Amino acid sequence: AMSTPQLLDTRKTVTRQIIESAGIPLLFIEKESGQNGTLSLYPGSNTVETWLSADGATISLSNGELVATRGLGDDLMGSIVPRVKTLKQRLGNPYTKTMRFLTADDQNDDLILECTVRQFHKSEEIVIFEKSHEVLKYFETCKTENYALENLFWQNSEGLTIMSKQFHSPSVGQLLIMRLK
């Protein structure tokens, strides 16, 4: 019988020294199950960045906001999100987000969400793999008639998302996403 490969815990193997010596942008993601890994930026990404893991899974982010995944299970096929770069520009105005999933028989299943975002006014310091970042925290609440979800984003003074906790799908739950470099 095949033995199940032991899941590597990136938190135990990756150090700041490894991150810096890699010399490339790196992303860390972790599922609610504890499964985690690092991804590198796919060349040629523009406003939507696509990050690729060693085993071929991808995650696409628009300034840190989850827009699509492949290979994570119950994948997010695509999303329509507001076209503003920073969350700050969304404050005070409700907006719509559409998350597209596939049903078992390959039909599109769109989750249409009404969302609002608010900002915690005090900046805070977060540490990601031994590196500290001064950030502002944003709290996004989205709902449909029978579903509610919450996303958290930590952005630096340039509006770059350094860390987030975002809803991925009903089966995967939330993803923790951290920008390592």
Which stretches of residues belong to each language-model region?
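Acidic, serine/threonine-rich low-complexity disordered tracts
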Residues: 1-60, 65-73, 92-181
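Surface-exposed beta-loop interaction hotspot
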Residues: 79-81, 86-89
